[in-house]
Amino acid sequence: MENIFFSKLTQVFIVALLCIFIYRTESAMSSHREQLSLTGRRMMANIPYPYGGIYVKPPPLKSKDSNQKGKRGETYYKPNSEIGTGPSHSGHGGSSIEHVSSP
């Protein structure tokens, strides 16, 4: 009788450990999937629009003449992209120094 009790207790213990293991694995996998999703979005952001990126339709242009039809360019949103800026032509800021005054 004592042998049956320990056998049942062992089975309950194994089932409890199995449930804990499955629960911990599911919680770990869901965060892992989220991380993969973020990594995938970052990778897709570096690919040009037809193959990646997010297409953004420009807002309609409001003009005074309603009969005027202008062609709007299509754009796409590329998250975390760098904005290309050239040197300043106004002399305020920019990366190059054109005039150096001597003391």
Swiss-Prot record:
Q: Which UniProt keywords apply?
A: Apoplast, Cell membrane, Cleavage on pair of basic residues, Membrane, Secreted, Signal
What parts of the sequence cross the membrane?
Answer: none
Q: Where is the signal peptide?
A: 1-25
Question: Could you tell me in which tissues this protein is expressed?
Answer: Mostly expressed in seedlings shoots and roots, and, to a lower extent, in leaves, but barely in flowers.
Where in or outside the cell it occurs: the entry states:
Cell membrane; Secreted, Extracellular space, Apoplast
Residue numbers spanned by region Disordered: 54-103
Extent of Basic and acidic residues compositional bias: 62-75
Q: Where is the composition biased (Low complexity)?
A: 84-103
Short sequence motif SCOOP motif: positions:
82-96
Q: Map motif SxS motif essential for MIK2 binding onto the chain.
A: 88-90
Disulfide cysteine pairs (residue numbers): none
Principal location class = membrane
The Gene Ontology terms for molecular function here are: LRR domain binding; receptor serine/threonine kinase binding
Q: Name one GO cellular component term.
A: plasma membrane
Keyword Zinc assigned to the entry: answer is: no
* Superkingdom in the source lineage: Eukaryota
Q: Which family does it belong to?
A: Belongs to the serine rich endogenous peptide (SCOOP) phytocytokine family.
Its assembly, as annotated, is:
Interacts with MIK2 (via extracellular leucine-rich repeat domain); this interaction triggers the formation of complex between MIK2 and the BAK1/SERK3 and SERK4 coreceptors, and subsequent BAK1 activation by phosphorylation.
Put simply, this protein is called Serine rich endogenous peptide 9
Which organism does this record belong to?
A: Arabidopsis thaliana (Mouse-ear cress)
**What is the organism lineage in this UniProt record?**
Eukaryota, Viridiplantae, Streptophyta, Embryophyta, Tracheophyta
